[in-house]
């Protein structure tokens, strides 16, 4: 039965198959045929991508084409007959537009894209895209000079992002160590062209930026084709570079069409060698500058010292310092003059005050009781020392003391006498004698 059934299947035409089931499965050839039919209905399509693999075998080209933005890749084949019609300079890393027709190989069960035409993406289109991105980033301020960080004068450790064993790495290290032998590098290798450029360079920048010992970062590549450098104008890479806290030096080395990383970086170097010279000071040049500075300082100090010596010599020739006795002599003359003037003023003051004292003495003498006594008046006192102002105060027989200008007399009161026509004005004074 099994053999009969196989014979019938092979010899008899099969009707259109229904849906495959467990009881009625499709043969592999039928499934493969249907897949090829579905794929062939797609026809030829123009696609844009980046060549990530390019190999030639037997005159044919076998390669892979990667999407420019998404993580998608397809293989392609260019037969030798077609290869003769496409640009001869196509290579890995180029951005291209290709006319591809999907082809499913039944025997091998593989899908390939047969290329009937392939050409570079127009430079005009690429430049237009870059200019739009440049304008956008400029409007956001990523190119402003004031946001650029200053490079350290002598970095202790320099971060380097470059291709492994590349000429750019050798140029940077050799020139930096020639200028300053003690300089240290921390190198992180990354793809510098192709589809891995953006993610690997971005990761390397962030790794070095997180290292506290790294004081400046150099991204170096030894020039190359414009299309090979497009990764250094990728928006995600540019924004990552703008967000670094460590100063960044771009040394891509392409003068004709500078990648946008040159605009975002804190410093743009024309070549990797130029980057080493801009980042690392030359020890020989610095020693020359030190010697020159010391010479300038010595010359300046000598000039200052000579100027001060001349000024001191000039001061010493002045009379005040040439002979100091004139100061004492002039002050001695002033002192003599002031002493004479003071003596004169004191003498005048004494004479004036002496005259005033004499005047006051005369006034005092004229007003004193002694002056009254000298004019012939007397003071009469009883035995108790009280002044007798009226006859009734000294009855007859009272012992009296009479004071005159020349002294005192003892007396005894007699009887009272009548008051004369011109009596004394002061009851305590007796009438003048000898009148």
Curated annotation (Swiss-Prot):
Alphabetized UniProt keyword annotations: Cytoplasm, Exonuclease, Hydrolase, Nuclease
Enzyme class: hydrolase
UniProt region (Disordered), positions on chain: 1-21, 413-435
Recorded catalytic activity of this chain's protein: Exonucleolytic cleavage in either 5'- to 3'- or 3'- to 5'-direction to yield nucleoside 5'-phosphates
Main subcellular location of this protein, as a coarse class: cytoplasm
Pfam family, one: tRNA_anti_2
Enzyme Commission designation: 3.1.11.6
Cellular localisation: Cytoplasm
Record-given protein name: Exodeoxyribonuclease 7 large subunit
GO molecular function list: exodeoxyribonuclease VII activity; nucleic acid binding
Record field: compositional bias (Polar residues): 1-10
Domain of life: Bacteria
Subunit-structure text: Heterooligomer composed of large and small subunits.
GO biological processes: DNA catabolic process
GO cellular component, one term: exodeoxyribonuclease VII complex
Organism of derivation: Leifsonia xyli subsp. xyli (strain CTCB07)
Family in the record: Belongs to the XseA family.
């Amino acid at each position: 039965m099994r053999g009969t059934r196989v014979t019938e299947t092979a010899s008899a035409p099969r009707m259109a198959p229904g849906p495959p089931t467990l009881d009625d499965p499709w043969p592999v050839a039928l499934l493969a045929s249907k897949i090829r039919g579905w794929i062939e209905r797609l026809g030829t399509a123009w696609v844009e991508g980046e060549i990530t693999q390019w190999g030639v075998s037997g005159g044919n080209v076998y390669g892979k084409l990667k999407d420019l933005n998404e993580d998608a890749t397809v293989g392609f084949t260019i037969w030798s007959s077609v290869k003769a019609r496409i640009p001869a300079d196509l290579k890995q890393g180029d951005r291209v537009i290709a006319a591809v027709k999907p082809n499913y190989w039944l025997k091998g069960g593989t899908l390939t894209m047969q290329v009937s035409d392939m050409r570079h993406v127009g430079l005009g289109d690429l430049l237009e895209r870059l200019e739009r991105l440049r304008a956008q980033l400029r409007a956001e301020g990523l190119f402003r000079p004031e946001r650029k960080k200053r490079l350290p004068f002598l970095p202790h450790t320099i971060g380097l992002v470059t291709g492994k064993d590349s000429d750019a790495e050798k140029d940077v290290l050799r020139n930096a160590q020639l200028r300053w032998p003690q300089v240290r590098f921390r190198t992180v290798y990354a793809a510098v062209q192709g589809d891995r450029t953006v993610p690997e360079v971005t990761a390397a920048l962030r790794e070095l930026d997180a290292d506290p010992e790294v004081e400046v970062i150099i991204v170096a590549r030894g020039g190359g084709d414009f299309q090979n450098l497009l990764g250094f104008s990728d928006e995600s890479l540019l924004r990552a570079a703008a967000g670094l806290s460590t100063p960044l030096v771009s040394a891509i080395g392409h003068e004709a069409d500078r990648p946008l990383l040159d605009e975002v970086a804190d410093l743009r170097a024309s070549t990797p060698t130029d980057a080493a010279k801009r980042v690392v000071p030359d020890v020989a040049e610095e020693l020359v500058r030190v010697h020159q500075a010391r010479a300038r300082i010595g010359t300046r100090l000598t000039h200052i010292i000579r100027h001060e010596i001349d000024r001191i010599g000039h001061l010493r020739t002045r009379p005040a310092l040439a002979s100091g006795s004139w100061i004492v002599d002039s002050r001695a003359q002033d002192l003599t003059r002031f002493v004479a003037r003071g003596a004169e003023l004191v003498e005048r003051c004494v004479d004036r005050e002496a005259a005033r004292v004499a005047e006051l003495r005369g006034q005092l003498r004229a007003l004193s009781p002694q002056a009254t006594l000298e004019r012939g008046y007397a003071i009469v006192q009883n035995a108790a020392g009280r002044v007798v102002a009226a006859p009734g105060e000294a009855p007859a027989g009272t012992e009296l003391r009479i004071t005159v200008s020349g002294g005192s007399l003892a007396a005894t009161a007699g009887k009272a006498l009548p008051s004369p026509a011109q009596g004394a004005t002061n009851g305590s004074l007796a009438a003048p004698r000898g009148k």
